[in-house]
UniProtKB/Swiss-Prot annotation:
Protein name: Adenosylmethionine-8-amino-7-oxononanoate aminotransferase
Lineage, opening ranks: Bacteria, Bacillati, Actinomycetota, Actinomycetes, Mycobacteriales
Pathway annotation from the record: Cofactor biosynthesis; biotin biosynthesis; 7,8-diaminononanoate from 8-amino-7-oxononanoate (SAM route): step 1/1
EC code: 2.6.1.62
Catalytic activity annotation: (8S)-8-amino-7-oxononanoate + S-adenosyl-L-methionine = S-adenosyl-4-methylsulfanyl-2-oxobutanoate + (7R,8S)-7,8-diammoniononanoate
Length: 423
Protein backbone atom coordinates (compact mmCIF):
# COMPACT_ATOMS: atom_id res chain seq x y z
CA UNK A 1 0.00 0.00 0.00
CA UNK A 2 1.33 3.42 -0.92
CA UNK A 3 1.91 5.91 1.86
CA UNK A 4 -1.03 8.34 1.56
CA UNK A 5 -0.43 12.07 1.70
CA UNK A 6 -1.37 14.07 4.78
CA UNK A 7 -4.24 15.65 2.90
CA UNK A 8 -5.50 12.24 1.81
CA UNK A 9 -5.42 10.98 5.40
CA UNK A 10 -7.29 14.09 6.48
CA UNK A 11 -9.86 13.57 3.73
CA UNK A 12 -10.31 9.94 4.70
CA UNK A 13 -10.43 10.10 8.50
CA UNK A 14 -10.80 13.54 10.06
CA UNK A 15 -14.10 15.30 10.65
CA UNK A 16 -14.00 19.09 10.27
CA UNK A 17 -16.35 21.75 11.71
CA UNK A 18 -19.83 22.05 10.20
CA UNK A 19 -19.02 19.54 7.48
CA UNK A 20 -19.76 16.03 6.31
CA UNK A 21 -16.91 13.51 6.37
CA UNK A 22 -14.63 13.58 3.35
CA UNK A 23 -14.54 17.32 2.71
CA UNK A 24 -11.29 18.51 1.10
CA UNK A 25 -9.38 21.07 3.17
CA UNK A 26 -6.31 23.19 2.55
CA UNK A 27 -3.25 22.12 4.52
CA UNK A 28 -1.51 24.71 6.71
CA UNK A 29 2.14 24.00 7.52
CA UNK A 30 3.05 27.07 9.60
CA UNK A 31 1.62 30.22 11.16
CA UNK A 32 3.48 33.43 11.88
CA UNK A 33 2.09 36.86 12.70
CA UNK A 34 -0.91 37.46 10.43
CA UNK A 35 0.17 34.76 7.98
CA UNK A 36 -0.73 31.15 7.30
CA UNK A 37 1.72 29.12 5.19
CA UNK A 38 -0.03 26.62 2.95
CA UNK A 39 1.21 23.26 1.68
CA UNK A 40 2.49 24.75 -1.58
CA UNK A 41 4.63 27.26 0.33
CA UNK A 42 2.39 30.27 -0.34
CA UNK A 43 1.47 32.59 2.52
CA UNK A 44 -1.95 34.13 3.04
CA UNK A 45 -3.28 36.65 5.55
CA UNK A 46 -5.45 35.07 8.23
CA UNK A 47 -8.26 37.62 7.98
CA UNK A 48 -10.36 35.50 10.35
CA UNK A 49 -7.87 35.58 13.24
CA UNK A 50 -8.48 31.82 13.16
CA UNK A 51 -12.13 32.18 14.12
CA UNK A 52 -11.72 35.51 15.87
CA UNK A 53 -9.17 34.39 18.45
CA UNK A 54 -5.60 35.26 17.35
CA UNK A 55 -5.88 38.97 18.15
CA UNK A 56 -2.10 39.41 18.61
CA UNK A 57 -1.32 37.37 15.51
CA UNK A 58 0.12 33.86 15.49
CA UNK A 59 3.22 32.90 17.46
CA UNK A 60 3.51 36.11 19.48
CA UNK A 61 6.87 35.90 21.30
CA UNK A 62 5.38 36.78 24.71
CA UNK A 63 2.80 34.01 24.42
CA UNK A 64 5.38 31.49 23.25
CA UNK A 65 7.72 32.43 26.09
CA UNK A 66 4.92 32.10 28.65
CA UNK A 67 3.97 28.69 27.27
CA UNK A 68 7.55 27.39 27.27
CA UNK A 69 8.22 28.59 30.80
CA UNK A 70 5.03 26.98 32.07
CA UNK A 71 5.64 23.70 30.23
CA UNK A 72 8.99 23.43 32.00
CA UNK A 73 7.23 23.76 35.37
CA UNK A 74 3.78 22.18 35.08
CA UNK A 75 1.63 21.72 31.98
CA UNK A 76 -1.38 20.29 33.79
CA UNK A 77 -2.69 19.32 37.19
CA UNK A 78 -6.24 18.58 38.31
CA UNK A 79 -8.09 21.56 39.83
CA UNK A 80 -10.31 19.57 42.20
CA UNK A 81 -8.88 20.01 45.69
CA UNK A 82 -5.77 21.71 44.30
CA UNK A 83 -4.85 25.16 43.01
CA UNK A 84 -1.82 26.77 41.39
CA UNK A 85 -0.14 30.12 40.79
CA UNK A 86 -1.04 30.51 37.08
CA UNK A 87 -4.77 30.31 37.88
CA UNK A 88 -4.47 32.69 40.82
CA UNK A 89 -2.45 35.26 38.86
CA UNK A 90 -4.76 35.05 35.84
CA UNK A 91 -7.87 35.49 37.98
CA UNK A 92 -6.41 38.57 39.65
CA UNK A 93 -5.51 40.11 36.28
CA UNK A 94 -8.81 39.18 34.63
CA UNK A 95 -10.90 40.66 37.44
CA UNK A 96 -8.77 43.83 37.40
CA UNK A 97 -9.22 44.11 33.64
CA UNK A 98 -13.00 44.04 34.12
CA UNK A 99 -12.74 46.89 36.61
CA UNK A 100 -13.51 44.43 39.41
CA UNK A 101 -17.09 44.24 38.15
CA UNK A 102 -17.08 40.53 39.04
CA UNK A 103 -15.93 38.54 42.03
CA UNK A 104 -15.62 34.93 40.91
CA UNK A 105 -14.23 33.13 37.85
CA UNK A 106 -14.94 29.60 36.60
CA UNK A 107 -12.52 28.29 33.96
CA UNK A 108 -13.47 25.85 31.22
CA UNK A 109 -12.19 24.39 27.97
CA UNK A 110 -14.17 26.37 25.38
CA UNK A 111 -16.61 29.20 24.85
CA UNK A 112 -19.54 26.85 24.43
CA UNK A 113 -18.83 25.25 27.80
CA UNK A 114 -18.51 28.68 29.41
CA UNK A 115 -22.08 29.36 28.25
CA UNK A 116 -23.23 26.04 29.72
CA UNK A 117 -21.65 27.09 33.02
CA UNK A 118 -23.27 30.53 32.86
CA UNK A 119 -26.70 28.98 32.38
CA UNK A 120 -26.09 26.58 35.27
CA UNK A 121 -25.10 29.54 37.42
CA UNK A 122 -28.30 31.43 36.61
CA UNK A 123 -30.60 28.45 37.12
CA UNK A 124 -28.98 27.47 40.41
CA UNK A 125 -29.01 31.08 41.62
CA UNK A 126 -32.73 31.31 40.82
CA UNK A 127 -33.31 28.25 42.98
CA UNK A 128 -31.25 29.94 45.66
CA UNK A 129 -33.61 32.92 45.46
CA UNK A 130 -36.51 30.60 46.18
CA UNK A 131 -37.70 30.47 42.57
CA UNK A 132 -37.41 26.85 41.40
CA UNK A 133 -40.03 27.62 38.75
CA UNK A 134 -37.53 29.83 36.90
CA UNK A 135 -36.08 27.20 34.59
CA UNK A 136 -35.93 28.99 31.24
CA UNK A 137 -33.78 31.55 29.45
CA UNK A 138 -35.05 34.51 27.46
CA UNK A 139 -32.99 35.57 24.47
CA UNK A 140 -33.47 36.97 20.99
CA UNK A 141 -33.39 35.39 17.57
CA UNK A 142 -30.35 35.50 15.24
CA UNK A 143 -28.15 34.64 18.21
CA UNK A 144 -25.42 32.05 18.53
CA UNK A 145 -23.88 30.78 21.78
CA UNK A 146 -22.19 27.50 20.92
CA UNK A 147 -22.72 23.90 19.88
CA UNK A 148 -23.13 22.04 23.17
CA UNK A 149 -26.69 21.14 24.10
CA UNK A 150 -27.90 23.89 26.42
CA UNK A 151 -25.88 26.47 24.49
CA UNK A 152 -27.64 25.30 21.31
CA UNK A 153 -30.99 25.83 23.04
CA UNK A 154 -30.39 29.60 23.22
CA UNK A 155 -29.27 29.87 19.59
CA UNK A 156 -31.80 30.88 16.95
CA UNK A 157 -34.13 27.84 16.82
CA UNK A 158 -35.20 28.25 13.19
CA UNK A 159 -32.67 30.28 11.22
CA UNK A 160 -29.59 29.08 13.07
CA UNK A 161 -27.57 25.93 12.49
CA UNK A 162 -29.30 23.78 15.11
CA UNK A 163 -32.88 23.44 13.84
CA UNK A 164 -32.30 19.67 13.51
CA UNK A 165 -32.46 19.43 17.29
CA UNK A 166 -35.90 20.99 17.71
CA UNK A 167 -37.89 18.88 20.13
CA UNK A 168 -34.75 17.52 21.79
CA UNK A 169 -33.20 20.69 23.20
CA UNK A 170 -34.59 22.47 26.26
CA UNK A 171 -37.26 24.92 25.12
CA UNK A 172 -36.34 28.54 25.76
CA UNK A 173 -38.19 31.82 25.15
CA UNK A 174 -37.27 33.90 22.10
CA UNK A 175 -37.87 37.55 21.30
CA UNK A 176 -37.60 38.62 17.64
CA UNK A 177 -34.15 39.50 16.31
CA UNK A 178 -33.07 42.83 17.83
CA UNK A 179 -33.27 46.12 15.92
CA UNK A 180 -30.08 46.72 13.95
CA UNK A 181 -27.56 49.48 14.58
CA UNK A 182 -28.94 52.92 13.81
CA UNK A 183 -32.54 52.05 14.64
CA UNK A 184 -34.69 54.88 15.98
CA UNK A 185 -35.20 55.32 19.74
CA UNK A 186 -38.87 54.58 19.12
CA UNK A 187 -38.07 51.25 17.44
CA UNK A 188 -35.77 50.28 20.31
CA UNK A 189 -38.39 51.25 22.92
CA UNK A 190 -41.09 49.27 21.14
CA UNK A 191 -38.81 46.26 20.88
CA UNK A 192 -37.99 46.39 24.59
CA UNK A 193 -41.67 46.65 25.48
CA UNK A 194 -42.43 43.55 23.44
CA UNK A 195 -39.47 41.75 25.01
CA UNK A 196 -40.67 42.65 28.50
CA UNK A 197 -43.98 40.91 27.83
CA UNK A 198 -42.06 37.65 27.44
CA UNK A 199 -40.64 37.79 30.98
CA UNK A 200 -42.99 35.37 32.72
CA UNK A 201 -42.63 33.37 35.94
CA UNK A 202 -40.46 30.75 34.20
CA UNK A 203 -37.65 33.11 33.13
CA UNK A 204 -34.45 32.89 35.16
CA UNK A 205 -32.19 35.09 33.03
CA UNK A 206 -31.79 36.95 29.78
CA UNK A 207 -28.77 35.88 27.72
CA UNK A 208 -27.50 38.00 24.82
CA UNK A 209 -24.50 38.72 22.65
CA UNK A 210 -23.96 42.44 23.26
CA UNK A 211 -23.49 44.84 20.32
CA UNK A 212 -22.56 42.10 17.82
CA UNK A 213 -24.43 38.89 17.08
CA UNK A 214 -21.70 36.66 15.69
CA UNK A 215 -22.30 33.37 13.89
CA UNK A 216 -26.06 34.00 13.91
CA UNK A 217 -25.67 36.66 11.23
CA UNK A 218 -22.96 39.22 12.14
CA UNK A 219 -25.68 41.72 13.08
CA UNK A 220 -24.79 44.92 14.94
CA UNK A 221 -27.06 46.74 17.37
CA UNK A 222 -26.91 49.85 19.55
CA UNK A 223 -25.77 50.31 23.15
CA UNK A 224 -29.21 51.73 23.97
CA UNK A 225 -30.69 48.32 23.32
CA UNK A 226 -28.28 46.63 25.74
CA UNK A 227 -29.01 49.31 28.33
CA UNK A 228 -32.71 48.57 27.93
CA UNK A 229 -32.21 44.83 28.39
CA UNK A 230 -30.16 45.47 31.54
CA UNK A 231 -32.96 47.69 32.85
CA UNK A 232 -35.51 44.93 32.24
CA UNK A 233 -33.39 42.49 34.22
CA UNK A 234 -33.14 44.87 37.16
CA UNK A 235 -36.84 45.72 37.06
CA UNK A 236 -37.91 42.09 37.12
CA UNK A 237 -35.04 40.79 39.28
CA UNK A 238 -33.71 38.46 36.61
CA UNK A 239 -30.08 37.70 35.86
CA UNK A 240 -28.30 39.21 32.86
CA UNK A 241 -25.86 36.89 31.09
CA UNK A 242 -23.66 38.47 28.42
CA UNK A 243 -21.78 36.32 25.94
CA UNK A 244 -18.63 38.34 25.16
CA UNK A 245 -16.78 35.38 23.69
CA UNK A 246 -16.55 37.12 20.30
CA UNK A 247 -16.67 40.77 21.43
CA UNK A 248 -14.41 40.66 24.48
CA UNK A 249 -10.84 41.98 24.60
CA UNK A 250 -11.23 44.85 22.15
CA UNK A 251 -12.78 43.43 18.99
CA UNK A 252 -15.54 46.08 18.79
CA UNK A 253 -13.22 48.95 19.72
CA UNK A 254 -14.22 48.65 23.38
CA UNK A 255 -12.46 46.33 25.82
CA UNK A 256 -15.82 44.75 26.63
CA UNK A 257 -19.05 45.67 24.87
CA UNK A 258 -20.99 45.87 28.15
CA UNK A 259 -18.58 46.92 30.89
CA UNK A 260 -16.96 49.62 28.75
CA UNK A 261 -20.40 51.18 28.33
CA UNK A 262 -21.09 51.27 32.07
CA UNK A 263 -23.30 48.18 32.19
CA UNK A 264 -23.06 45.53 34.90
CA UNK A 265 -24.06 42.00 33.93
CA UNK A 266 -24.51 39.33 36.57
CA UNK A 267 -22.62 36.76 34.52
CA UNK A 268 -20.18 37.18 31.61
CA UNK A 269 -18.62 34.61 29.27
CA UNK A 270 -15.24 35.16 27.63
CA UNK A 271 -13.12 32.90 25.43
CA UNK A 272 -11.55 32.96 21.95
CA UNK A 273 -9.10 35.86 22.45
CA UNK A 274 -8.52 35.04 26.13
CA UNK A 275 -5.37 33.10 25.21
CA UNK A 276 -4.69 35.29 22.18
CA UNK A 277 -5.76 32.33 20.04
CA UNK A 278 -2.86 30.25 21.34
CA UNK A 279 -5.06 27.42 22.65
CA UNK A 280 -8.63 26.63 23.67
CA UNK A 281 -9.70 28.23 26.96
CA UNK A 282 -12.64 30.19 28.35
CA UNK A 283 -14.00 31.69 31.54
CA UNK A 284 -17.34 32.47 33.12
CA UNK A 285 -17.30 35.44 35.49
CA UNK A 286 -20.04 36.22 38.01
CA UNK A 287 -20.86 38.59 40.83
CA UNK A 288 -20.73 37.64 44.49
CA UNK A 289 -24.54 37.83 44.59
CA UNK A 290 -24.79 34.97 42.09
CA UNK A 291 -22.14 32.93 43.91
CA UNK A 292 -23.77 33.36 47.31
CA UNK A 293 -27.18 32.28 45.99
CA UNK A 294 -25.63 29.14 44.49
CA UNK A 295 -23.97 28.45 47.85
CA UNK A 296 -27.31 28.24 49.67
CA UNK A 297 -28.98 24.86 50.26
CA UNK A 298 -31.76 25.76 47.80
CA UNK A 299 -29.13 26.79 45.25
CA UNK A 300 -27.45 23.41 45.43
CA UNK A 301 -24.66 24.43 47.77
CA UNK A 302 -22.02 24.16 45.03
CA UNK A 303 -21.71 24.75 41.30
CA UNK A 304 -21.94 21.24 39.91
CA UNK A 305 -19.47 21.45 37.06
CA UNK A 306 -15.83 20.39 36.83
CA UNK A 307 -13.98 19.88 33.53
CA UNK A 308 -10.93 17.62 33.61
CA UNK A 309 -8.75 20.41 32.22
CA UNK A 310 -10.36 23.19 34.28
CA UNK A 311 -7.90 26.05 34.91
CA UNK A 312 -5.18 24.23 32.97
CA UNK A 313 -1.90 25.86 34.11
CA UNK A 314 -0.55 26.16 30.57
CA UNK A 315 -3.69 27.91 29.35
CA UNK A 316 -3.71 30.16 32.42
CA UNK A 317 -0.09 31.21 31.87
CA UNK A 318 -0.64 31.99 28.19
CA UNK A 319 -3.85 33.90 28.98
CA UNK A 320 -2.01 35.96 31.59
CA UNK A 321 0.58 36.91 28.97
CA UNK A 322 -2.17 37.76 26.47
CA UNK A 323 -3.87 40.05 28.99
CA UNK A 324 -0.53 41.74 29.68
CA UNK A 325 -0.39 42.63 25.98
CA UNK A 326 -3.96 43.95 26.20
CA UNK A 327 -2.97 46.06 29.22
CA UNK A 328 -0.43 47.98 27.12
CA UNK A 329 -3.38 49.63 25.37
CA UNK A 330 -1.85 49.28 21.90
CA UNK A 331 -4.95 47.45 20.72
CA UNK A 332 -7.01 50.65 20.97
CA UNK A 333 -5.03 52.47 18.27
CA UNK A 334 -4.74 49.31 16.20
CA UNK A 335 -8.47 48.55 16.20
CA UNK A 336 -9.39 52.18 15.57
CA UNK A 337 -7.08 52.28 12.54
CA UNK A 338 -8.33 48.94 11.20
CA UNK A 339 -11.91 50.15 11.56
CA UNK A 340 -11.19 53.29 9.51
CA UNK A 341 -9.37 51.29 6.84
CA UNK A 342 -12.13 48.69 6.57
CA UNK A 343 -14.73 51.43 6.22
CA UNK A 344 -12.72 53.12 3.47
CA UNK A 345 -11.92 49.87 1.69
CA UNK A 346 -15.29 48.15 1.87
CA UNK A 347 -17.77 51.03 1.55
CA UNK A 348 -17.49 51.13 -2.29
CA UNK A 349 -18.91 47.59 -2.38
CA UNK A 350 -22.22 48.88 -1.05
CA UNK A 351 -23.33 49.88 -4.53
CA UNK A 352 -22.39 46.69 -6.35
CA UNK A 353 -25.15 44.42 -7.69
CA UNK A 354 -26.03 41.64 -5.27
CA UNK A 355 -24.70 43.43 -2.18
CA UNK A 356 -27.37 43.97 0.48
CA UNK A 357 -25.28 45.74 3.12
CA UNK A 358 -21.75 46.64 4.17
CA UNK A 359 -21.05 47.25 7.84
CA UNK A 360 -17.96 47.75 9.98
CA UNK A 361 -17.45 47.94 13.73
CA UNK A 362 -14.02 47.93 15.32
CA UNK A 363 -11.94 45.20 13.70
CA UNK A 364 -14.99 43.55 12.12
CA UNK A 365 -15.92 44.00 8.48
CA UNK A 366 -19.07 42.44 7.03
CA UNK A 367 -20.47 42.26 3.50
CA UNK A 368 -23.98 40.86 3.41
CA UNK A 369 -25.09 39.59 0.02
CA UNK A 370 -28.65 39.31 -1.26
CA UNK A 371 -28.18 35.59 -1.96
CA UNK A 372 -26.18 32.83 -0.31
CA UNK A 373 -22.47 32.96 -1.06
CA UNK A 374 -20.77 30.20 -3.03
CA UNK A 375 -18.32 29.44 -0.24
CA UNK A 376 -15.67 27.66 -2.30
CA UNK A 377 -15.67 30.23 -5.10
CA UNK A 378 -15.50 33.18 -2.70
CA UNK A 379 -12.79 31.51 -0.63
CA UNK A 380 -10.67 30.79 -3.69
CA UNK A 381 -11.14 34.31 -5.05
CA UNK A 382 -9.80 35.70 -1.77
CA UNK A 383 -6.95 33.18 -1.70
CA UNK A 384 -5.95 34.27 -5.19
CA UNK A 385 -5.32 37.67 -3.60
CA UNK A 386 -3.42 36.20 -0.65
CA UNK A 387 -6.17 36.28 1.97
CA UNK A 388 -7.94 33.54 3.93
CA UNK A 389 -11.64 34.08 4.67
CA UNK A 390 -14.42 31.73 5.76
CA UNK A 391 -17.81 32.92 4.42
CA UNK A 392 -21.12 31.49 5.59
CA UNK A 393 -24.71 31.96 4.46
CA UNK A 394 -25.03 35.34 2.78
CA UNK A 395 -22.01 36.76 4.55
CA UNK A 396 -18.45 37.59 3.57
CA UNK A 397 -16.70 38.93 6.64
CA UNK A 398 -13.32 39.48 8.25
CA UNK A 399 -12.00 39.83 11.80
CA UNK A 400 -8.27 40.39 11.27
CA UNK A 401 -5.61 40.30 14.01
CA UNK A 402 -5.02 43.64 15.68
CA UNK A 403 -1.43 43.66 14.40
CA UNK A 404 -2.64 43.78 10.78
CA UNK A 405 -0.81 46.62 8.99
CA UNK A 406 -2.41 49.22 6.74
CA UNK A 407 -0.93 47.50 3.69
CA UNK A 408 -2.32 44.15 4.81
CA UNK A 409 -5.71 45.69 5.55
CA UNK A 410 -5.79 47.08 2.01
CA UNK A 411 -4.96 43.61 0.70
CA UNK A 412 -7.86 42.17 2.71
CA UNK A 413 -10.23 44.72 1.20
CA UNK A 414 -8.97 43.92 -2.30
CA UNK A 415 -9.57 40.22 -1.64
CA UNK A 416 -13.11 40.90 -0.45
CA UNK A 417 -13.79 42.92 -3.60
CA UNK A 418 -12.66 39.88 -5.60
CA UNK A 419 -14.79 37.53 -3.51
CA UNK A 420 -17.88 39.67 -4.09
CA UNK A 421 -17.22 39.86 -7.82
CA UNK A 422 -16.26 36.19 -7.99
CA UNK A 423 -12.81 36.76 -9.45
Amino acid sequence: MENPSLRELDHRNIWHPYAAPGVRNRLVTKTDGVFLTLEDGSTVIDAMSSWWSAIHGHGHPRLKAAAQKQIDTMSHVMFGGLTHEPAIKLTHKLLNLTGNSFDHVFYSDSGSVSVEVAIKMALQASKGQGHPERTKLLTWRSGYHGDTFTAMSVCDPENGMHSLWKGTLPEQIFAPAPPVRGSSPQAISEYLRSMELLIDETVSAIIIEPIVQGAGGMRFHDVALIEGVATLCKKHDRFLIVDEIATGFGRTGELFATLSNGLQPDIMCVGKALTGGFMSFAATLCTDKVAQLISTPNGGGALMHGPTFMANPLACAVSHASLEIIETGMWQKQVKRIEAELIAGLSPLQHLPGVADVRVLGAIGVIEMEQNVNVEEATQAALDHGVWIRPFGRLLYVMPPYITTSEQCAQICTALHAAVKGK
